Each structure stands twice: as C-alpha cells, then as structure tokens.
C-alpha cells in the first residue's frame, strides 16, 4: 500500500488536477485536505473538459472514494451544484465522504470577504470572494459551523442564530451593509443538510480503515506552496496550508501514511492577483504564453500574470514539501520560442540571493538572474514516446533536475490524459 500527495509548487494553477486524475487510476481513495471552492481544477478526457472546485479530480476514473477532509471549508450550495454537474455528465459511480469536522461557509462569510477586500483598496490581496478567509477566521476563533452541525438541527439553529447576530453587528456597524435574517439562513442550510447528510462522516476513521485494507490513497492539494498561509508570499496567500504538512492535519492522517510527494511544476510561472513576481514577463512573450497556455482562472476567469520558470521558488518548495518527484506540466506552451529562460537566483541591492525571502518588501526589489537555454520551435503535443521530444526540450528538463536535485518523473505536454508520460515509477505506474 502506498500514499502519494500531489502538491502545487508555485502560486497554484500548475495542473494538479490533471496529475491527480492521471495518478488516480491506481488509487482507491482520493482526498482533498484544505481550501474550498476557491480552487479550480480542470481535467480533459478525450474531447470533454471538466472543471471542479471541491470534489477531487480523481473522481473521473469511477468506483473511487472521494474524501473532503476536515481541513476544508465547504460551501454546501456549491458542493450540491457540483454533484449535480457530475450527475448531468454521467459521473455517478463514486462514493463521497465529507468530514464532519470540515467547516461550513455561510452567506455572511462571502459578504464579509467582499467588504474586507474593498476596504483594503490598493492593498487588496486578490481574494476570490468565496468567503474562504472569513470562514477560516471563524474556525480559528472557535465560533464556526462544522459539517457535523448540519446533522444536528438544534446545534445548527443555536450556532446560526448566535453567529448571525454577531455578523450583523459587524456588517452594519463597520461596513454599512445589510445584515441577514437568521431564520432564513437556518431554513436554507437545513435544505442543504438534507441532501448532504448521507455523506457526512468521520473521515479519519475511514482513512485508517482504508489504509489497513491496503488501499492506495492519493491526497490532492489545492492552490500552491506560495499561497500557503505560513510558507507563502504573505499576506498574498490563502487561509489554509496547501503544503505537504497540511495533508496530515487537514485529512486526519498520520505522517507515516505518506510515501511519496509529487511537486507539480508548471514549465513557466503564473500568478493571480497582487504581490511581487521576480520573473514576471509583461511584454509580448508574456502575452504569447498567456494565450497559448489559456492562462485565465478556472474559478475567477481573471487573466494570470506570466513569467519564466523560477528555481529559487522551486527549491524553496522542495525544501518545505520534501518532493520525491516533479510533475512538469504545460511543456508544450514553450514550443514556439527560440530562447527559454530560467530564473536561478535574485539580485537584491547588489547581493546575489539564492534562497526565497520571507519579506515581500525585499522580494519586490529582487531582480531575476536568468540562465538562457535554446528553445524548440516544433510541436510536441502529439509525441508518443520520450525519445520523440526535441533535444532542447530534454535539456530543459535535465536542467530543472540539476537545479532542484529532484527527478522530473512526469511530463505533461497537453491537456489530455494521453499527453502525459511517466519517466520514473510513482506508486504502480
């Protein structure tokens, strides 16, 4: 039995959904352990493209158990809509388990999210407005509503009445916004509870039993390392921990259960929202990459900022997460350039920096130190074998391995499952 974690190594949007879908064929259980519907995972199967926000991407293989862990914050309405979306596409042969310890996004969380972002003005962090941060704030303040409360009407009513009273004071007195009617909120969430009750269980008990049965377990992170609350580019971060350590806390799984960590690396860099971005491309090359890579947010539709690959970031992510493997994605997007660059260090006030700084003030002053490599101006999207890759593409991959000391074990060069090659064994692949 083996368990693998798929982790984003950059600012999210690395292609974790595709990698999870590919590895899920050998897994009986797929687990999301943090975040909420601020995540957006895209999976292409044949000519069909599926977009998910809450349910793990491995669901498309059928006969899998998908777990939403305690570290998640769940919008019940969004989850029910996603289940309907899957049903309408004929995806029904799966089991769903929702941790009774996962927290519930309430309607006031979304309004507070928007109000707080507006108040920040030019210092906004680029939130998705889904209520993720305020829900995690209530969790940390020990006043949140959990999924387990949905199956206890009395507990749900008491918690919602108290919370709505307090949130209305905040909304009206601080933001000048309209409040909520507690009874309407209670009735709305009772309807959600009726649909979700069968799935709400103690997920950690299930995971222990699955582990003891010898099931293959795959953990799917949302967002990426640089959006991690503790290790990301704070304050431009999410409110949870997408890194490897977050999987144990956010799923209720012991560390010894984890065998391998796959760091998903986009062949170039992207970022949504504000914050420093040393290798950013703001000219024609950046526009070319954005259009060819379809770099627009799955959840927000916002255009992503684009830059060259940054191995200062990759080595930071490697250290934080303990990567055993790299899954390199969107390699085909770089196929039209004569020269490709990799950022290998930063210059800060004349000093060379090789380690990723915690200070956003320092990072904003860092200039990239680039290595240039020859590009390959040929289509690689239809290759069937590793040997068919152009030598320049192989050299690019080899240089990433040299700079990070991690093998590139998976190479993806298009959105479809067939456009993926395994170079080194991960689990049973």
Curated annotation (Swiss-Prot):
Molecular functions (GO terms): adenylosuccinate synthase activity; GTP binding; magnesium ion binding
Name this protein carries in UniProt: Adenylosuccinate synthetase
Entry GO CC: cytoplasm
Catalytic activity: IMP + L-aspartate + GTP = N(6)-(1,2-dicarboxyethyl)-AMP + GDP + phosphate + 2 H(+)
Top-level taxonomy: Bacteria, Bacillati, Bacillota, Clostridia, Natranaerobiales
Organism encoding this protein: Natranaerobius thermophilus (strain ATCC BAA-1301 / DSM 18059 / JW/NM-WN-LF)
GO BP field: 'de novo' AMP biosynthetic process; IMP metabolic process
Statement: the UniProt record of this protein carries the keyword GTP-binding: yes
Top-rank taxon: Bacteria
Binding site for Mg(2+): 13, 40
Sequence positions that bind IMP: 13-16, 38-41, 128, 142, 223, 238, 302
PROSITE patterns, alphabetized: ADENYLOSUCCIN_SYN_1 (PS01266), ADENYLOSUCCIN_SYN_2 (PS00513)
Functional pathway: Purine metabolism; AMP biosynthesis via de novo pathway; AMP from IMP: step 1/2
Family recorded in the similarity comment: Belongs to the adenylosuccinate synthetase family.
């Amino acid at each position: 039995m083996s368990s693998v974690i798929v982790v984003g190594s950059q600012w999210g949007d690395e292609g974790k959904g595709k990698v999870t879908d590919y590895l899920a064929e050998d897994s009986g259980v797929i687990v999301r352990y943090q975040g909420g519907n601020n995540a957006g995972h895209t999976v292409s199967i044949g000519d069909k493209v599926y977009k998910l926000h809450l349910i793990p991407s491995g669901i498309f293989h059928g006969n899998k158990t998908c777990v939403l862990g305690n570290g998640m914050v769940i919008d019940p309405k969004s989850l029910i809509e996603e289940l309907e979306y899957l049903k309408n596409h004929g995806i029904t042969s799966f089991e769903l388990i929702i941790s009774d310890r996962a927290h519930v996004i309430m309607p006031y969380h979304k309004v507070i999210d928007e109000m707080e972002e507006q108040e920040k003005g030019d210092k906004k962090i680029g939130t998705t407005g889904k209520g993720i941060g305020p829900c995690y704030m209530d969790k940390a303040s020990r006043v949140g509503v959990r999924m387990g409360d949905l199956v206890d009407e009395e507990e749900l009513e008491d918690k919602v009445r108290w919370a709505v009273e307090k949130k209305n004071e905040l909304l009206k007195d601080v933001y000048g916004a309209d409040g909520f009617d507690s009874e309407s909120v209670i009735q709305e969430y009772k309807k959600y509870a009726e649909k979700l009750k069968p799935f709400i269980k103690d997920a950690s008990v299930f995971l222990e039993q699955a582990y003891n049965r010898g099931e293959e377990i795959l953990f799917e992170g949302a967002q990426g390392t640089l959006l991690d609350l503790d290790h990301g580019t704070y304050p431009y971060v999410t409110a949870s921990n997408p890194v490897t350590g977050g999987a144990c806390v956010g799923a209720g799984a012991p560390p010894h259960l984890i065998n391998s960590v796959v760091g998903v690396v986009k062949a170039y860099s992207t970022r949504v929202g504000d914050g420093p971005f040393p290798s950013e491309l703001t000219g024609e090359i950046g526009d070319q990459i954005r259009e060819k890579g379809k770099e627009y947010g799955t959840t927000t539709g916002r255009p992503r900022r684009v830059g060259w690959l940054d191995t200062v970031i990759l080595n930071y992510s490697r250290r934080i997460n303990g990567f055993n493997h790299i899954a390199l994605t969107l390699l085909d997007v770089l196929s039209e350039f004569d020269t490709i660059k990799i950022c290998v260090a930063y210059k800060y006030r004349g000093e060379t920096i090789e380690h990723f700084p915690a200070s956003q003030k320092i990072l904003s002053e860092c200039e990239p130190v680039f290595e240039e490599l020859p590009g390959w101006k040929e289509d690689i999207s239809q290759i069937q074998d590793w040997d068919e890759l152009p030598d320049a593409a192989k050299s690019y991959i080899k240089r990433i391995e040299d700079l990070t000391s991690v093998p590139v074990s998976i190479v993806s060069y298009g959105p479809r499952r067939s456009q993926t090659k395994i170079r080194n064994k991960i689990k049973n692949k």
